Swiss-Prot record:
GN (gene name): rpsN
Record GO terms (molecular function): rRNA binding; structural constituent of ribosome
Family (UniProt): Belongs to the universal ribosomal protein uS14 family.
Protein name (Swiss-Prot/TrEMBL): Small ribosomal subunit protein uS14
Function: Binds 16S rRNA, required for the assembly of 30S particles and may also be responsible for determining the conformation of the 16S rRNA at the A site.
GO CC field: cytoplasm; small ribosomal subunit
Pfam families registered for this protein in UniProt: Ribosomal_S14 (PF00253)
Assembly information from the UniProt record: Part of the 30S ribosomal subunit. Contacts proteins S3 and S10.
UniProt keyword terms in alphabetical order: Ribonucleoprotein, Ribosomal protein, RNA-binding, rRNA-binding
Gene3D superfamilies hit by this protein: 30s Ribosomal Protein S14, Chain N
PROSITE patterns associated with the record: RIBOSOMAL_S14 (PS00527)
Transmembrane segments: none
GO BP term, pick one: translation
Length: 89
């Protein structure tokens, strides 16, 4: 499981991205890169990391489910993910 501080940092970044999204789009459209560079660094969407909602793992995530591969497999085998079945052919 990821450290609590790493998860909290990512949540803080999500809030900043949401707060400055409109202003950032406006500045991009106007081509005002000087003002854009004055915005907080963490308000850029590229600094966000998709993390597992259960464990906070930052790698091997399925966006559709919001889970890392380990938790996805565990929950799928337990039958807790509706519509997901193990493939067999």
């Amino acid at each position: 499981m990821a450290r609590k501080s790493i998860i909290a940092r990512n949540e803080k970044r999500k809030k900043l991205v949401e707060k400055y999204a409109a202003k950032r789009e406006e500045l991009k459209a106007a081509g005002d890169y000087q003002a854009l560079s004055q915005l907080p660094r963490d308000s850029s969407a590229t600094r966000l990391r998709t993390r597992c909602v259960l464990t906070g793992r930052g790698r091997g995530n399925y966006r559709k489910f919001g889970l890392c591969r380990n938790m996805f497999r565990k929950l799928a085998l337990e039958g807790k993910l509706p519509g997901v079945r193990k493939a067999s052919w």
